Amino acid sequence: MKILKCKYILCCDESFKVLENHAIIFDKKIEKILPNDELKSLGILDSAQVFSTPIAMPALFNAHTHLEYSANKAHLDFRGFSNWLKSVFENRGGISKALNQKILNKEIKKLLKSGVCGIGEYSSFGLEAKMLAKSPLRSRFYCEILGTNEAFLEQAWSAFLERFKSANELKNERFCPALAIHSP
């Protein structure tokens, strides 16, 4: 059992209340939140790990990310979804070549530092799967299959199946592969 004693707890309830001088009792999930002065009455202080922090708040989940594009932000057009999607298709080949572990690691650290605990990562190439599977982020890893020219259908389908199989081999408590089917 762990106890996190907090000066303030920012709640994301309907009223966004702020609890002052409260503690969060948890193991794998939150069991109880109560005022700090009620901790002694529970009789668990001697057997629990006790930590303290000035502020605690819920972590954030970014439901739709594209970390594989992190190396190409300057080449993509962010003036609306249609412009962005067009720029992704135009720069598709360079996107996968420019990505590396250093860039991915930097992006994962930025997410964690900003309070993000989990992501829905949409991936066309699968290059970020191994790194996400080992990271502290919780990831729903969507293997994308994009609409394609009929001449390349078999090739695109085979590549997708291989990416999805590889992602499933990495599945763990924090990394869960899934499917994302697009047809632009």
Segments from the language model and where they lie:
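N-terminal metal-binding scaffold of metallo-dependent hydrolase/deaminase domains
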Residues: M1-L42
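Flexible loop residues that form catalytic
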Residues: C12, H66, S124
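Short loop/helix-cap segments at secondary-structure boundaries that form the rim of catalytic
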Residues: D37-L45, K130-P136
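Active-site gating loops and adjacent loop-to-helix segments of metal-dependent hydrolytic enzymes
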Residues: S70-K102, R140-L146, L161
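Short, acidic/polar
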Residues: L99-K110, S123-L127, Q155-F164
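Short acidic/polar active-site loop segments enriched in Thr and Asp
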Residues: C117-G118
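Metal-coordinating catalytic core of metallo-dependent amide/deamination hydrolases
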Residues: K130-P184
